[in-house]
């Protein structure tokens, strides 16, 4: 049987990795030869979840067309966030919870996108719809994805469906969602030992906003100063990325997981758009973004609107 690769976006977060594993397992149960893979490094937070539930991480690939003809995308749809040669393969399915942009296919596909906080929440429904029991380890990874995307149910992207799914999955996994979740988020917020290049690419996504090319990277921290103490070095590596990719804006967002506020570091010729979008003034290229924790709901649409205004 021909193999199908299942993967999340570049610079994968916990949902991108764990949903690839969970959906590949569901597809295998339904008779498909599916393998989860990843398009980037595994973060400390994701590694904590994999280690905790004793699951091996997916192997790394940059291109897919040399291996397979067909792929399934989870947790993304935009071409620039996907495999480098995504145009050379057929996308069979997309399971996602983000905006739909820069995406088209030549054939009809199964496309499931729901306004929930996490791809794993959708997969929880799909396991039920297909009458497949979720293994304990996989339930733990799916729970981890929801906790990560919802910042332990505090993000404005978090819905009642996400909370309900997390409680169900926690029961299957045999963990206390709140206790485990805080441990996992703290593991993800431990940025010691990371290079500046790693910090700005741990969870980075590229977007087309009007005519502007924008990259938004986000890291969680227990104290934003632990990251911003390195601002001069961060600006140097961000400026190099801006030049290399021809970006109009690179916004590096440091989110405090205890206060649920963020600090944005804006570099690029369109940095002033951040000021316009949030009605703030950049001082030394940074501004506090009160109550902003979600890239999907509080950054991407706000900046997109500002660029198109």
Curated annotation (Swiss-Prot):
Location (main, coarse): cytoplasm
Note on cofactor: Binds 2 manganese ions per subunit.
GO CC entries: cytoplasm
Annotated catalysed reactions: diphosphate + H2O = 2 phosphate + H(+)
SMART domains on file: DHHA2 (SM01131)
Pfam families: DHH, DHHA2
Cofactor: Mn(2+)
PANTHER family the UniProt entry points to: BNIP - RELATED (PTHR12112), MANGANESE-DEPENDENT INORGANIC PYROPHOSPHATASE-RELATED (PTHR12112:SF22)
Assigned protein family: Belongs to the PPase class C family.
InterPro entries: DDH_dom (IPR001667), DHH_sf (IPR038763), DHHA2 (IPR004097), DHHA2_dom_sf (IPR038222), Mn-dep_inorganic_PyrPase (IPR022934)
Stated name of the protein: Probable manganese-dependent inorganic pyrophosphatase
UniProt-annotated binding residues for Mn(2+) 1: 9, 13, 75
Entry binding sites for Mn(2+) 2: 15, 75, 97, 149
EC numbers for this chain: 3.6.1.1
Key words, A-Z: Cytoplasm, Hydrolase, Manganese, Metal-binding
Record organism: Bacillus cereus (strain Q1)
Molecular function GO terms recorded: inorganic diphosphate phosphatase activity; manganese ion binding
Cellular localization per UniProt: Cytoplasm
